Regions:
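Accessory "access/gating" subregions that flank catalytic or transport cores
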Residues: 5-140
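Hydrophobic alpha-helical bundle architecture
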Residues: 127-168
Length: 168
């Protein structure tokens, strides 16, 4: 409620775009094979991991490994110059999209609940940005990935509790 009160009227449209870009980014990364651009010739992993775990019998392993594939997919899209969401930065662009796709795969939540959870994740990212640093150049990669993990934790916690006060 707080977020909707203080944001612009078109904020929901903006968040829908964030959702779409994250979802599409993971999908593209899962579908693409080969090597990443550049001289290092780093092989893409997301498609292979996603395909291999489809035969996994343990449902917890299946979900865990699929989520890992989602994170790789978004990170590989970033590394190949694809369209991503900086959440909070390019260097950590796989964390929140992986959790978003995880939540969608669980099929336990309504779309509006996932959208509200994304807003809470953004709130956490803004708190860190205003009171600390999300910049790898300024505070090291732990600032980027730590913030992304905090945002993802808030996203998942909101889906579980629907209580922003408990999260913040």
């Amino acid at each position: 409620e707080y977020i909707n009160e203080v944001e612009e009227d078109d904020f929901d449209e903006y968040m829908e775009r964030i959702y779409d870009v994250m979802f599409d980014c993971v999908n593209r990364g899962l579908e693409t094979q080969g090597v990443l651009p550049g001289k290092l010739e780093v092989k893409r992993k997301a498609n292979r991991i996603f395909t291999e775990v489809s035969n996994d019998k343990d449902p917890y392993d299946l979900l865990r490994k699929r989520t890992m594939a989602f994170a790789y997919a978004a990170a590989e899209e970033n590394a190949s110059g694809g369209l991503i969401v900086t959440a909070p930065t390019c260097g950590a662009a796989g964390v929140l999209p992986a959790c978003l796709r995880y939540a969608i795969e669980l099929d336990l939540y309504e779309h509006h609940e996932i959208m509200d959870a994304l807003k809470v994740a953004g709130l956490i990212g803004n708190i860190v940005k205003e009171n600390g640093s999300i910049s790898g150049a300024e505070a090291g990669c732990q600032a980027e990935v730590g913030t992304a993990c905090s945002m993802a934790a808030a996203f998942l916690a909101y889906l579980d509790t629907k209580d922003v006060d408990e999260i913040v």
